[in-house]
């Protein structure tokens, strides 16, 4: 999960928390492995939070089904644990599932949504939480240097992104599917079954050389480990 792989060990550094990943083949948590991980003995660190990512970046932008989310929430609830949804691309999941965005976030104690990915805002994200946690969240935001001044202009862009951005996501998904199918027809190693939203991962022998070739042709993509990642978005032409 992004929370585990890409945040510089921040949970340990800032909160003294140990993050324990659970297998999630195809981005879907292995419920049996999760249930086993939740069984803690007297010599193991206690669990304080269960976090889930949807859509799942490293799995190729795949979507966790709502029934799987509900099962994860049930497991946490049975043990008195709060839950957090890393929903940076929550609206992509909602479009794929054919539901309102609120349905993807439903049942979690807290959730995060990015405004600057598929929704198209220049910057920003939202923390969704119950009213009783708001004061504490604002205190920690200030403590960690996250307070802004004169943020109204960017907030206006964020509101517009929330209102207008979701309309464009289905097209993003369709472009990703078309791209994946085109790469597959060229004989390149792409898993068509993993293309559910707006990401396409490509297995190549020389990722850096491949990316240089793309840049020479005016195409920008990224490298994730030994793979090349394409992300489709509203600023691309058909």
Task: Set out the residue ranges of the language-model regions.
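Conserved PLP-enzyme active-site core in the AAT-like
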Residues: 1-217, 221-236
